[in-house]
Swiss-Prot record:
Its EC number is 2.3.1.275. This is Glycerol-3-phosphate acyltransferase. It comes from Yersinia pestis. It is a multi-pass membrane protein. Pfam families: G3P_acyltransf. The chain crosses the membrane at residues 4-24, 56-76, 80-100, 112-132, 138-158.
Length: 216
């Protein structure tokens, strides 16, 4: 392994360790995603506790921190195996962030960003797979699981030299979704539409406060 490849792997891990969910929530003065909602510092949980704008910001930042290191490594002509390790390092940083006590998210958006530089055709297929699964099922987690399962086959079709690293990345994502898989199997996983409805609905405390104001 060259010094440049090693440097890019370390750089990718450090980029991944920047938890955009935590930072966006701090800037927007929202609850800490690690202690509210599902407890997962990711875009889906931020959607639950902070709404669409904050969730989109987290999603974009998470994609970029996976895409940027891999894109730079690609431009530096780093071999496919080390490109794959760079992608995995970015996801490991997101999952086990050194800046946030090694407690991070599940790495889906970061993995998507890391895979994107392989090709826009692959990126489109991955996006379509996730969207179709979510639209048909209503489960964001199922979209991530199905995408992770199919990703190595897509990559094998378009760029076979990246199949092994992407397969490793998919295994990492599936491992992080172990609890979601169990909840899906038991029928206890929450649908993304329910999260949006709950955000729009007022809490009993808010309704009581409004009644008090009317009485005054």
């Amino acid at each position: 392994m060259s010094a440049i490849a090693l440097g890019m792997i370390i750089f990718a891990y450090l980029c991944g360790s920047i938890s955009s969910a935590i930072l966006v929530c701090r800037v927007a003065r929202l609850p800490d995603p690690r202690t509210h909602g599902s407890g997962n510092p990711g875009a889906t949980n931020v959607l639950r506790i902070g709404g669409r704008t904050a969730a989109v910001a987290v999603l974009l930042f998470d994609i970029l921190k996976g895409m940027l290191p891999v894109w730079i490594a690609y431009l530096l002509h780093i071999p496919p195996l080390y490109l794959g390790l760079t992608a995995i390092a970015a996801c490991l940083g997101h999952i086990y962030p050194v800046f946030f006590h090694f407690k991070g998210g599940k790495g889906v958006a970061t993995a998507f960003g890391a895979i994107a530089p392989i090709g826009w055709d692959l990126t489109g297929l991955m996006t379509g797979t996730w969207l179709l699964t979510v639209l048909l099922s209503g489960y964001s987690s199922l979209g991530a699981i199905v995408s992770a399962l199919i990703a190595p086959f897509y990559v094998w079709w378009f760029k076979p030299q990246f199949t092994f690293p992407v397969a490793m990345l998919s295994c990492l994502i599936l491992m992080r979704h172990h609890d979601n898989i169990q909840r899906l199997w038991r029928g206890k996983e929450g649908k993304i539409w329910d999260k949006l409805r709950k955000k729009k609905q007022k809490t009993p405390a808010e309704e009581a406060a409004e009644l008090e104001e009317k009485e005054d």
